[in-house]
Design a protein with these regions (language model features):
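Small-residue-enriched segments and motifs
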Residues: 13, 38-40, 82
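Mixed-charge, Lys/Arg-rich low-complexity intrinsically disordered regions
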Residues: 2-25
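Residues marking helix boundaries in flexible regions
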Residues: 9, 25-27, 56, 77, ...
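Tryptophan-anchored aromatic micro-motifs
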Residues: 27-33
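Residue-level detector of beta-strand face positions
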Residues: 5, 29, 58-60
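Intrinsically disordered, low-complexity, charged/polar segments
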Residues: 63-87
Length: 87
């Protein structure tokens, strides 16, 4: 599938596309959609509920040598970050 890409913080990233939760790979790196420096790494996916599950992306980043983690709804995560496809 062809995805639209742009250079964000010196990296080629997929823009204006929302991946299905099962397409988001652990270990993938995502650039900040606002163009600011840095990236986050997907650590995992959390699923809550069974009939209509709520899925969150668990991600991390480093700041001043310290690792931080957070989680966001899969849609909100992709509104803020773009999948890096080339460094």
């Amino acid at each position: 599938m062809n995805y639209e890409t742009e250079i964000i913080d010196g990296r080629k990233a997929v823009v204006r596309h929302f991946f299905k939760a099962h397409e988001i790979q652990i270990g993938s790196r995502w650039a900040r959609a606002d163009g600011s420096k840095g990236y986050v790494t997907v650590e995992g996916l959390n699923t809550y509920g069974s009939t209509n599950p709520w899925i969150e992306v668990v991600y991390s980043w480093e700041l001043n040598g310290e690792k931080f983690t957070h989680e966001k709804d899969v849609f909100i995560f992709q509104s803020k970050y773009c999948l890096i496809v080339e460094d």
